[in-house]
Regions:
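Bacterial Sec-dependent N-terminal signal peptides
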Residues: 1-22
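Residues within alpha-helical transmembrane segments of multi-pass membrane proteins, especially transporters
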Residues: 13-17, 219, 364
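Accessory carbohydrate-recognition regions in carbohydrate-active enzymes
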Residues: 21-318, 322-359, 366-437, 448-471, ...
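TPR repeat positional signature
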Residues: 358, 442-443
């Protein structure tokens, strides 16, 4: 296990500090509600409170009490929702107010009390979860089950089980995701036959506690049963919760913080928790011990990862994993190669810019990871950046919008001119200056990978591009700007304006985005003074 110590710089922990670290419950510092206060403004409160395991296959959220699977900002979850109620749902009783003072949000445990008096708790395993709903003594104990396109539902009151599946139609894929579920309860129930609105209502009598064990599978119903048997059979809520707490303490304990206030420690470990959610594992182990995963309606053998969100993470998250979670990073770079093999594209966040898988691979190689073929990676990267997914689709604007992050929009101009002109005559290529800068960074990473591995062919190809960022730098005022086909910089440039030739930023923010050539940027800006 790798452990690091954070003061102002990383250093190795002494043995006595390690012993002290083992005795701490670091999950107590984590607040999964941090960053979840959503407001209408863009990028405010986009963190979902989740219970899951480190890079866990599944995540669960108190939105209702739901399985959200691959949820991310701008990407919906898989939509299996449990709602504890004290009366049958109606437009008037659809929601209950949460007592915010009652909320405990930890990586391994979530608890809250609602205005109807129900205390709700949940805790995760790798692919499953357990729930405990405690109802007021004199109230009805009801549980509503709903989901996106929920179908195939069978309620077996004798076995205290409900099975079925939901279908999620993603905004990032043309294929529909089918997720099978198996729910087992620790109390007898009756089923309300009125299933209007796609909701199944279970009645457990008066008050008391209702325990629920939930397993899901993206492969089939049989796999859900296998997973249930492996992860939940015979286990109580407290046992699952404690095992999850130990897993999280093991991961959070890889970095120890010294000094600072309790509030600063809570902030640090709450953020560290977020770094350990992705990339998420997305494979299941069948009854014969084979690791399998479902993709695009087919089932394949091996391990697979989802939710890398490379544009947001390539320069920070994966570099951190290389230090504190190396074994998983070794497996992830293999998964990157597998993803490209299956889909024809590197994962790139579907609407974001750049081809940052090559950055992750180059960084991994530089730090000694050897679980992929660098020549194969460079060849696939070259094919990736000399085409665009938009050019391969003729299915309307919806699909065009949601594949524009795959491949390299504007690659023709980028290779011919060394930058992508702005403004364009059409809306085909947006955010042209940001694209130029990030394409340049990725080509630099490819050049470095080729150089580290002695690949003269690709080293010569990418050496032509490693200073392209300079082509959109205006020495007159020291900013990157939009530049038209005649070489003229944008006369209406405003360094504070969001958008235009930039993506998710303005001229000031993109001014400091050449992380691969700090010395060159110092020179462009007139020197160190």
């Amino acid at each position: 296990m790798i452990r690091k110590k954070l003061l102002l710089l990383f250093a190795l922990l002494p043995a006595c500090a390690l012993c002290a670290q083992k005795q701490q419950d670091l999950t107590a510092y984590v607040n999964t509600m941090q960053g979840s206060h959503n407001t209408p403004e863009f990028s405010h409160g986009r963190c979902t409170p989740l219970v899951t395991l480190p890079q866990g296959v599944n995540s669960w959220s108190p939105v209702g009490f739901s399985y959200v699977g691959r949820s991310a900002a701008g990407v919906g979850g898989c939509g299996i929702v449990l709602r504890p109620l004290t009366e049958a749902p109606s437009p008037e009783t659809a929601t209950a107010t949460v007592d915010t003072a009652s909320i405990i949000g930890r990586p391994h445990y979530f608890r809250m009390r609602t205005s109807d008096g129900i205390l709700s708790e949940m805790s995760p395993t790798e692919r499953c979860a357990v729930f405990r709903f405690t109802y007021p003594r004199r109230s009805e104990a009801l549980l509503a089950l709903s989901g996106e396109e929920m179908d195939g539902v069978e309620a077996d009151a004798a076995a205290r089980c409900v099975t079925g599946y939901v279908i999620r139609r993603s905004n990032v894929s043309q294929a529909a995701d089918k997720t099978w579920f198996l729910l087992r309860f620790d109390r007898d129930f009756t089923v309300d036959e009125d299933r209007k609105g796609g909701t199944l209502l279970l009645r457990f009598g008066r008050g008391g506690t209702v325990g629920v064990q939930a397993a899901v599978s993206k492969i089939d119903a049989r796999q859900a049963r296998v997973t249930f048997g492996r992860e939940l059979e015979g286990k109580r809520f407290g046992e699952v919760c404690e095992a999850a707490r130990e897993r999280w303490n093991g991961m959070l304990g890889r970095i120890e913080v010294e000094g600072g206030t309790p509030e600063q420690r809570r902030t640090f470990y709450s953020c560290l928790f977020r770094t350990m959610l992705r990339p998420a594992q997305d494979y299941e182990t069948d009854a014969e011990g084979r690791e399998r995963f479902a993709y695009d309606g087919e089932v394949y053998e091996g391990r697979y990862h989802v939710n890398p969100i490379l544009w947001d993470a390539y320069r920070s998250l994966f570099a951190l994993h290389n230090i504190i979670n190396r074994a998983e990073e070794e497996r992830y770079v293999q998964s990157l190669m597998r993803t490209q093999e299956l889909t024809g594209w590197w994962p790139s966040g579907h609407v974001m810019i750049g081809n940052h898988a090559i950055s992750v691979l180059a960084d991994a190689w530089a730090k000694g990871i050897r679980t992929f073929d660098p020549e194969e990676a460079l060849g696939r990267y070259y094919r990736e950046i000399t085409r665009s997914a938009v050019d391969t689709l003729n299915n309307g604007d919806y699909n065009r919008e949601h594949v524009r992050g795959y491949g390299r929009l504007g690659f023709e101009d980028y290779f011919a001119m060394g930058y992508i002109p702005y403004p364009q005559g059409t809306d085909r290529v947006m955010e042209t200056t940001s694209k130029t800068i990030e394409y340049n960074y990725d080509d630099f990473c490819a050049w470095r990978l080729a150089r580290m591995t002695g690949n003269d062919f690709y080293e010569r190809i990418f050496a032509r591009h490693i200073y392209n960022y300079r082509n959109v730098f205006d020495p007159a005022d020291g900013f990157f700007k939009g530049r038209d086909r005649e070489g003229r910089f944008d006369e209406d440039f405003n360094p504070y304006e969001w958008g235009g030739p930039f993506v998710e930023g303005n001229g000031w923010q993109w001014r400091f985005s050449v992380q691969q050539d700090a010395r060159g940027m110092i020179g462009l800006m007139g020197g160190e003074e």
